A protein has these predicted regions:
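Hydrophobic, lipid-facing positions within transmembrane beta-strands of outer-membrane proteins
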Residues: 24-30, 91-97, 135-141, 183-185, ...
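C-terminal beta-signal and adjacent terminal beta-strands/loops
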Residues: 159, 321-326, 346-401
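Gram-negative outer-membrane beta-barrel transporters
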Residues: 209, 214-220, 236-324
Length: 401
């Protein structure tokens, strides 16, 4: 419920929202593995069956002097929300076969084929049934160039699972100016081909590992926001399939024990990644990044073990590359950025193996900010009506366990 202050000691209710959803899932999986050719090959085959059910209902009441109030909605006037009551059910069958082949001590190949057959039915204010089927192959080739260098190539078709909440109307928890987020009963699964090259180098004297990865993703039926407005006076966006896109990037990781400076129990981990993406915006017709897509991330951490004192402690620093990380909707564009995230821990183990751990999260004055640009008539019209800047400051939190 939402209330407006109408005076120093009075208030008036102007909104009632009641949202209830229940998700149930049942999964059965069985497989059998068979060795071939004296252990140089093996085959695993099996099947998985999954049932997922979402029951969802939403009631909306507003202050409307010309309407008929309902006690069930807190004394406010009911509003008809499309697709407010619905049951969505998926039955999915997935037979699979996985083949492992060790050519020699330096080369191996894992290949697999999964077939997904699913039926999604929706009952309630909207009744609809749709069937999907996908063949999902994968190849994973590994080659030990030397005893310390391994190369790996992967090609895989990845099909993303649908979120049932996108089919039905629900509360809009991200936008206080909009009460309801519409559902879309016409969603299809998004999927992509993933191509990866990996290289791993084991450092001398067993002090650690360094690795690098490059990837390319070729997307089909990407899910982002689309226009599902009932009328020009009631602009509404929902998740929907916007077309094809691509995503690519690179990543470098390292994990090193500082034995070279006489601290073999000090482990330092570092990583850096960069990525970009491209898709055609359904509202503006421009090429842009995927919504919420990262530009990159850097992490640095260390862990120091002191076995003689039964103590270990460490610190982790994480930072994302902000700037131009946007979310596009029908009537607004959001830009997100945040400060680096720092955590620390201290752990002690007693002689009777009781462990005490102290953690400190979000060291410093961590801040997350969101800028929202809201446009009159939609972002395609280009008439900026409102600029909102929302920042959250979170202090340091401590825990002892």
């Amino acid at each position: 419920e939402r209330w407006n202050l109408t005076g120093p000691y009075s208030e008036s209710k102007n909104l009632f929202l009641d949202s209830v959803s229940t998700t149930r899932e049942r999964i059965v999986r069985s497989s059998y593995t068979l060795d071939l050719f004296r252990g140089s090959q093996d085959i695993e085959f099996g099947a998985e069956r999954a049932q997922t059910i979402l029951d969802s209902s939403l009631a909306l009441g507003v202050l409307n002097p010309s309407g008929i109030a309902s006690a069930a909605l807190g004394g406010l006037v009911p509003v008809n929300v499309p697709n407010a009551r619905s049951t969505v059910e998926e039955m999915r069958y997935e037979p699979f076969i996985i083949h492992n082949w060790v050519f020699n001590s330096r080369m191996s190949l894992e290949s697999s084929v999964l077939y997904e057959d699913s039926k999604i039915s929706q009952r309630g204010q909207i009744s609809k049934e749709r069937n999907y089927d996908y063949v999902k192959p994968k190849l994973d080739f590994r080659y030990d160039l030397t005893p310390t260098i391994q190369l790996r190539g992967t090609m895989e078709k990845i099909v993303q699972q649908l979120s049932f909440n996108d089919f039905v109307a629900a509360l809009d928890t991200r936008d206080e100016d909009r009460d309801v987020q519409f559902g879309n009963e016409n969603l299809k699964q998004e999927w992509y081909w993933n191509y990866e090259l990996n290289a791993e180098y084991r450092l001398p004297n067993d002090i650690g590992v360094a690795s690098a990865r490059v990837f390319y993703e070729d997307w089909t039926d990407r899910i982002e926001r689309i226009d599902v407005s009932p009328s020009k006076d009631n602009l509404q966006g929902a998740n929907g399939n916007v077309g094809d896109g691509e995503k690519y990037g690179a990543e470098i990781n390292s994990s090193t024990r500082m034995r070279m400076i006489g601290l073999p129990n000090l482990l330092i981990n570092a990583s850096i990644s960069v990525e970009d993406s491209r898709i055609t915006d359904p509202f503006l017709g421009i090429d842009r990044r995927f919504s919420f897509s990262w530009r990159g991330r850097q992490t640095l951490s260390f862990r120091h073990d002191l076995p003689s004192k039964r103590i270990n402690w460490g610190i982790r620093y994480s930072n994302s590359q902000d700037g131009n990380r946007k979310f596009y909707d029908l009537i607004d564009i959001e830009v997100w950025d945040s400060d680096p995230f720092v955590t620390a821990f201290f752990e002690w183990r007693s002689v009777d193996n009781t462990t005490v751990r102290f953690e400190a999260n979000q060291l410093g004055n961590w801040e997350f900010c969101r800028k929202r640009f809201r446009y009159s008539g939609g972002i395609a019209e280009g008439y900026l009506a409102e600029l909102e800047r929302n920042c959250n400051h979170r202090g340091t939190t401590f825990s002892l366990r």
